[in-house]
Amino acid sequence: MKKIIIAIDGYSSTGKSSFARRIATEMEYIYIDTGALYRAITLQLAKTGILTSDNRIDRDAMKQELQRTEIHFQFNEAIQKSETFLNGDNVEEQIRSLQIANQVSYVAEIPEIRAYVDQILRDLGRERGVVMDGRDIGTAVFPDAELKIFMTSDLHIRAERRLKDLLPNQPDATLESVLSNLQERDRIDSSRETHPLMQAPDALLLDNSHLTMDQQMEWFQSILPNYLNDDCNH
Ligand code: DC
């Protein structure tokens, strides 16, 4: 069967990665969490002091650091999930902290960083058969993706979902801190100059505020056949 690229973009904490992962499993495609690359770079820049706690970045040092930075994903059979490795270390847990979430949008605004990540993503998608979730996959990284989905959902519902995910590892997280982080990230992601978050004209809109994962998958299965035939040029 023809292999395609499925691009899933949308606002923070709309459940893009759970949805994308489930699609990848069902289709036996590779799932790529593109936000993890921006988060890993943010961690590296913070660790080296190139990114300060008030989000200032030494651009020259950043360019040099990028040349020394190697990021890859490795599938962990035990938990059946792919994990992020930064210069050989498993950083999957560290990159999910609220600290990194608070800083990552400032790093993702920088054109050189976006070019670095785009190159990795285009290599990973060369053979197609991938599901990628992010902010600019359908608009900038793979504008020729056969199937594009843009996800949104109610801000409060997103914040509650995100808090539930964070609490086991960060018991001091509050609904207020999560809400303000989501609003701030949405604002920066949507207003940056390079590849801002927006719905591609040919993307399907999925508002999952009141949908379970099974309902989202039902919707997905209903639209998928339209994008798998050979003469599809959506
Ligand atoms: O999906 P996420 O929350 O892990 O993404 C983290 C940040 O990375 C998000 O605030 C914006 C940025 N990002 C981006 O600019 N472009 C992408 N394709 C993916 C993520």
Pin down the residues of each PLM region:
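Hydrophobic anchor at the beta1->P-loop junction of P-loop NTPases
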Residues: 6-8
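P-loop (Walker A) phosphate-binding loop of NTP-binding proteins
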Residues: 11
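N-terminal phosphate/diphosphate-binding loop that engages ATP/GTP or pyrophosphate donors
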Residues: 26-95
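NTP-dependent small-molecule kinase module
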Residues: 85-95, 101, 160-169, 188-234
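ATP-dependent NMP and nucleoside kinases share a basic, alpha-helical "lid"
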Residues: 92-168
